[in-house]
Amino acid sequence: MKSDIEIARSCAMKRIEDVAATAGIPADVLEHYGKYMAKVPLSLIDEDRVASNRLILVSSISPTRAGIGKTTVSIGLSMALNRIGKRSVLALREPSLGPCFGMKGGAAGGGYAQVVPMEKINLHFTGDFHAITSAHNMIAALLDNYIYQHRSEGFTLKQVLWKRVLDVNDRSLRNIVTGLGNTTDGLPAQSGFDITPASEIMAALCLADSEADLRRRIENMVLGISFDDKPFTVRDLGVAGAITVLLMDAIKPNLVQTLEGTPALVHGGPFANIAHGCNSLVATKIAMSLSDYAVTEAGFGADLGAEKFLDIKCRKGEIHPRVTVLVTTLRGLKMHGGLVGGEPHEQERQALVEGFANLDRHVRNMQRFGQPVVVTLNKYGDDTEEEIALLSEHCKMLGVGFAENNVFAKGGEGAEDLARLIVETIDRQGAKRIRMAYADDDTIEEKVNKIARNIYGARSVILKKSAEKKLVRIHAWGMDRFPVCIAKTQFSFSEDPKQVGAAKDFDITIRDFVINGGAEMIVAIAGDIMRMPGLPKIPQAEKIDIVRGQIEGLA
């Protein structure tokens, strides 16, 4: 089979104004980035259409390092809905350069279920990540300058919380010292870098519903702590307007297309393990305004991305998915059942059955939120009919719908059965309100405990002393009502990536809380998770090259 990039190049793209026309977007509102990409205005949001849309959330079992294929299935499903006569628009996150050149590779789908132009989307796209990186680091520079220029007046901060960001995987930047050299080179300070998808500006942009809301959120971002234990914010720095100006274009969603011409809004890119893992609220609302069945994705497994989509994004945006689709693979289930590789067939079968426990917990979790659930198998060429039948029968026992899909090889045609099942499920179940995992007025400790115990299956939550100190501050600053975003490994329900399947008898250790006053969430750091990833021994960058003017090896 052709590579992803070869498939993408072999399919003729429509001009972006033609894609816009299929979604009912007037050509004169498009801001073109070449022939095949454009930004669209927030004025396209129609709250009445949003309220009536049959939003479909795509999530998955806990992923393996080989991936599960949520983005590919999301793209294929939206194309399939259009193929069966429904009106569908897709909303996805933007890829990050860090994983693209690191371990994961690109994030524009795969096979015959891709968004295009895939090279541009996977690389610099329309510059949103650059704008977010620039805005975040501009705040860091302005804060350092403020401290430097006002030191003669006795001004200083007890603690600076604001780090810098960069859209690369670079472990050597996690902890740095700035301001070395002469006295004119700034004041020495211990700091560090996070990856751009973990930036609070990324989160705020993805949760803001307007430019004014984004400016308000930027004003409230906490940069440091004064000696009287008060928050020092961007408002105190007096630069919220300047930072918002840097993001004026970045807040507008990007319109592209799938290989079959389905309109796709690709906008924002927080990771689900270290951030809230959803594309922008405005992109989702525009997709809902332009269609009857909007399809969107939440990152990693349902314990991370879907929980945060429902508890954070839906709480803020007052949107309600009509169904959650859980993507799985036989290979992934076997790995959750303890399969290492090379075992005899009978051991593979047993591993598959034992791996069902991971799927079961994700199904129960989504049902806990009041979500109707459909399970879809992302098919591989070596899947056997016997094993597929086992999974189908197991889903029947769980009382949830099941459909295979083969969108990687067949595009939208490979998900038509899945699309019909989803439409039937939505029609049968009707609209249901989300049952959130916690209430707004729960304390931060209660929110963390409810997620850890009820969603992850943890025995208890252990708070490190540093986390306990942060909680005192959160209480004192009146931020208890913020939702909680737990940063945790994506490979396990626990904080240990090696505990696959449905982990039991484990505790969740919270070692720190990050106060996101602008994004209006409290990030709880669980276990050893890092907000600046490192590169693997053999990064994807070694496979990428340019040959006779064409990019090769990007996947």
Model-flagged regions — what are they?
Residues 1-555:
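Flexible phosphate-sensing "switch/lid" loops adjacent to ATP/NTP-binding sites
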